[in-house]
Amino acid sequence: MLIKYHLLLYFLFFIKCYPQTAILDLALKHPDPAIQEVLRNKEKHEIQILLTKIKRTPSEEILFEEEDYQIDERRYFYPASTVKLPIAVLALQKLNILKSKGVIITGDTPFFISTKEGDTIIQRDTTHNKGKLTLHHLIKKIFLVSDNDAYNYLFDFLGRDYINMELTKRGLNHTQVYHKFLFGADNVNTWEYTFLDKDQNVLYHQSSLHAELELKPNKLKGVLKGKGYNSLDVLVNKPMIFEQKNRISIRNLQGILQRIIFPDIFSNQEQFDLTDEDYKFLRKWMSRTTLESNNPNY
């Protein structure tokens, strides 16, 4: 973490002092021992860096200038919690698709989640001022505190097939979303979702979805990680295999951000199917901290 802060400070310094210079190159050549120690062991640390400068022409056209270090889309990159970003986006997109089919629900419509057998998974969210479980509130929690349960609930609202087909359709071809953040979770069959009006009448019910799309294992460089891991409280003394773990390349991750901030530079096919209000909502909560939120109030 300290190294990340060092690099960030150097980027800011060089942006101010050397505006026409290759900023990333200058930062990586800085004699700071922490940076140089990592660079001497760059294969061990699996460093990939993508720095993008945003420029506007006199006619307000958006241009991106990139600098990169060891970017390799053939090398596995585990996205960790950043995988929650496209899930939040696609939840809003699916809501728009449902509306276009005559389903009268919004991001603030309360719902509950149950199993196929009818057992309730969750019906209230105690972090909501009124105890409501809503799509908008789950998205807020993802951006504010990287809430794993919020991601899991949105994952199943979408279904794994929808997630991966939509991301591929948008040109994000180095991305696969395999799983929830829940030990022992069923990532193939979803829970059921029931949306209610203020009088508790059912507005929309989504039955369990079954994933049919066969996801190809990540046959990339670097899918073996570490030298041991815990499985059911037993130490396994060999690297963990990440062939069937979530994957987003750094360029695809940047591409998702660019589609949110600058959607108009992409073709209609590459853009997410979002409204202006959706974009405003995403940008607002992506930029907020817990101190700037009173619902949820952490």
What residue ranges belong to the model's regions?
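Active-site-adjacent helix/loop patches that line small-molecule binding or acyl-intermediate pockets
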Residues: 22-32, 44, 115, 126-259
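Conserved SxxK-family serine transpeptidase/carboxypeptidase catalytic domain
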Residues: 243, 264, 268-298
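Bacterial Sec-dependent N-terminal signal peptides
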Residues: 1-22
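Extracytoplasmic
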Residues: 44-47, 66, 72-74, 78-83, ...
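Active-site SXXK
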Residues: 78-106
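A short, well-structured edge-of-sheet supersecondary motif
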Residues: 29-71
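Soluble periplasmic/extracytoplasmic beta-strand elements of cell-envelope proteins
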Residues: 48-52, 86, 110-112
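Short, glycine/proline-biased beta-turn/loop segments that scaffold the active-site neighborhood
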Residues: 97-131
